[in-house]
Amino acid sequence: MKIIDSHLHVWSNDTNKYPLNPERPTLPEGNATAEFLLECLDEAGVAGTLIVQPIVYGFDHKYVTECLHKWPDRFVGMCLINPKDPNAPAELERLVKEEGYRGVRVNPGLFPQGVSLDSDISDRIFEKAEELNIAIGFLINPEHFDAVDALMTRHPEVQVIIDHFGRCKAEDISANSPFQKLLSMARHPKLHIKISGFPVASSPKAEGVGERSEQDWPYRDVQPMVKQLIEIYGARRLMWGTDFPFIVRQCGYTRGLTLLSQETPGISPEDMEWLLSKTVEKVFGDFGTE
């Protein structure tokens, strides 16, 4: 079975060649180079990945772009848009047409102070994404679900992905929980969910990225969320991701795969194939050979 990791980040240890985002002047702990990632992929039998532009570089895509060009058979890219830049749609077009990015990430935490995610800034991003025929990925909290709901109602032809279970927590999937709101948004046929970031979704709430220990694996309290998402969205609208490099110190890269592929019972072989590769290729195109 072909396996594609739909969500991870890479960065270099060389901060002179690849300067850091001034607002994030320190690299997170751990090795996140593309070379180390490839070692992890080969060990786990993962064919390719969607690299999401990391916040450590802000809107400077130099390192990720070099990785995409150097290993085009393994990597596909999702760029990060600057919602404060009035020329952001033009820059998005350049990144897609000249550098080969196949999607764009939107982070409401980067919007101008006091400006809602449900605003004309997002409308312009949606319009450009539809023109370019690319997907939009959202890093959001449950408080932003209503905004994404409204945007998708206005722009129903755009493929949208919500990362990391929408940052819902396994400890509360009751009738009035944010997770139930996420399930209700399945009425948008082009909305997809990344089943990524298992350790952070797991209960009790993680005390920052990477705080869940290896002993917590395989995060069985997250499994009911996965099963409800499959039931409501269908596996064809879900995609698995590790959130490398953070997964490495949370439980190890290979275990970040097997927690779904081997440790989550009741998923049919056909559904598993969609979760592990077919959905992400449906949205982003081919990721090279198996």
Whereabouts are the PLM-identified features?
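Mid-to-C-terminal alpha-helical segments outside catalytic/metal-binding sites
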Residues: M1-S6, P25-G48, K227-Q228, I232-M239, ...
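Active-site beta-loop-alpha junctions enriched in small/polar residues
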Residues: H9, P54-I55, L80-K84, N107-G109, ...
